[in-house]
Amino acid sequence: MLEDFDTLKSDFFLYARRRGADFDEFPLGIKPDNLGGRHLEIKADGRFAVVGTDRGIETERRETYSKSALFNWLIELYA
């Protein structure tokens, strides 16, 4: 099942708030910036990937099927 990005963001804000992390906006977009930043990929099989790219080259990738694992990564990386 393909997760709706808006639903994922809403779930993240609730999850982060319960863990004492306050976010004004979702920390990742869904398109690569190719400038050393990260983006989120949501795969059709339900997998989430946090991917870093720099000048078109993938430099980092973390994948999971778990929303809570994804949310923990985002809090760890951006809080």
Where are these regions (language model features)?
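N-terminal "first-domain core" detector
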Residues: 1-39
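Conserved aromatic
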Residues: 2, 61-64
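Non-transmembrane, interaction-prone segments in cytosolic or luminal domains
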Residues: 20, 48-50, 73
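Generic alpha-helix signal with a bias toward terminal, lower-confidence helices
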Residues: 24, 28, 60-62, 76
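Short aromatic-glycine-(Arg/Gly/Cys) micro-motifs in beta-strand/loop hairpins
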Residues: 30-59
